[in-house]
């Protein structure tokens, strides 16, 4: 894994802890280091150690901040230079409580980094993730995973049938 969120306090340590739990190496930069340089180092580490999968954790960003979107575009570019054809999958993580703002977020991120799918988090909260249907119908982006908490087993592969059933079940229980 690449710890390229070098700006949020504790982000690097948090990813290192996950790496230890999962017995996965973590390439990490220093606080406030250029995230693109961390990704270059991580790509080189992965190639040198015959690692097939490299997950790059980047800082959360608002799509309205042009400098942060330019930084994301740079990260996308440098990974492609280090590993031809990469990145092979780009997933945008969206908080289920975001609501319809998530659509414009996904649209602008997709313009910058060619998103392959969505990971929807905080499904354990009050939001039912109604944004799932809008993202799929308006942008054609599939939801790949949904998160129900912060434990290892709380990230589940998205099952559209189970998701729709849970919405209908909740609706029936209300009436």
Give the location of each predicted region.
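P-loop/Walker A NTP-binding module and the surrounding RecA-like catalytic core of P-loop NTPases
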Residues: 1-175
């Amino acid at each position: 894994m690449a710890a390229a969120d070098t700006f949020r306090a504790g982000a690097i340590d948090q990813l290192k802890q996950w790496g230890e739990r999962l017995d996965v190496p973590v390439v990490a930069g220093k606080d406030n280091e250029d995230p693109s340089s961390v990704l270059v180092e991580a790509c080189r580490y992965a190639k040198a150690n015959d690692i097939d999968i490299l997950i790059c954790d980047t800082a959360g960003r608002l799509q309205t901040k042009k400098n942060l979107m330019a930084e994301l575009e740079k990260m996308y570019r440098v990974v492609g230079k280090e590993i031809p054809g990469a990145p092979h999958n780009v997933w945008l993580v969206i908080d289920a409580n975001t609501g319809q703002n998530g659509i414009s977020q996904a649209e602008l991120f997709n313009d910058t980094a060619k998103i392959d799918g969505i990971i929807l988090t905080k499904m354990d909260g009050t939001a039912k993730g109604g944004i799932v249907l809008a993202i799929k119908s308006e942008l054609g982006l599939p939801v790949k995973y949904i998160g129900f908490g912060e434990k290892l087993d709380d990230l589940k592969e998205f099952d559209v049938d189970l998701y729709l059933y849970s919405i209908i079940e909740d609706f029936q229980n209300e009436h």
